[in-house]
Amino acid sequence: APETFAICLSFSINFNKIMNIAIVGATGNVGRKILEVLEKKELAIDNLYLLASSRSAGSKINFNGNEHEVIDLETFDFSKVKITFFAAGGKISENFAEIAAKHSLVIDNSSFYRMDPDVPLIVPQVNSDHLNNIKKNIIANPNCSTAQLVIALKPLHDLFKIKRIVVSTYQSVSGGGKAPMDELIEQTKQALEKNKIKSKNFTKQIAFNAIPHIDVFADDGYTKEELKMTNETKKILDNDIDLTATCVRLPVLVSHSESVNIEFEKSFTLEKVREALNNFEGCKVVDERADGGYSTPLEAEGKDETFISRIREDKTVTNGLNMWIVSDNLLRGAALNAVEIAETLIKNNFYGK
């Protein structure tokens, strides 16, 4: 469990009084999931403000049995709230997060602030101690594929010290938003009906296919998604870890999967690996060496846990381990992690400087 610690902000917030929360991007995939998680967690929210673009303003969203009208982000007064969740992409965070952070604590799901040295990048079960000095009143949520990875790596790194990781991801289309999900369904229908397919949100046909390309290419041949995994894992867990990634988009609606090869500095036993994972908050081992004795994206959808399967030694390298990691990218990789950051702050009674 996360340690108890003092959290300092540049202004004072007292959570023992009124709890007002805003969600920027409330109509999107992650924004709606944040609402679901908040309902499930039963946090004592006094006033909830749902923010989106002017196109969505005026629409209604249900929360805890009550309808809430969506408000235009550009006209909102952030002094009304204590925590603001941003779930609307990097450009919106770039333009509005620092405005919100003048009055509230910002928890940002976009990539914009993740590598900012003055912004902590947080998975509460892994590095909540990094919350002890929040300089910009902004906390970053990691990339969805990184979040589930570091949850599984943390207990093993603590015991055996990780030297190097090779990870291949099998990522669902929901990582790109609602439009790619709708397109996968439409492309699947078109393919089954033998109709011509024209991709809108993908570089190639996604139905019945696999695309080894997520986000833009860098000069060295890696994609931005792959570089995110490398850089974010180092920032969250340990800068000395070497990590190389290949990220692939699959025709799956929800949940990301990862094939992970780890080289440790210390020797291990599979029994100790399983025990460490099972005892770590947020992890669940499903690893029977039999038909169906492993987790898949379908089983992970809607679940809070990160599931670890196919745990086995890599006998081609000293102290090598292989495993398969699956998690709901909209929950563990985004909404759930963001809400757990807020919970951690509330439990530790963060205060102003």
What are these regions (language model features)?
Residues 14-16:
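Intrinsic-disorder-associated, low-complexity terminal segments enriched in Asp/Asn/His/Tyr and depleted
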Residues 84, 173-353:
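Charged docking surfaces used in two-component/phosphorelay signaling
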Residues 18-206, 242, 306-307, 311-317, ...:
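N-terminal Rossmann-like NAD(P) cofactor-binding subdomain of oxidoreductases
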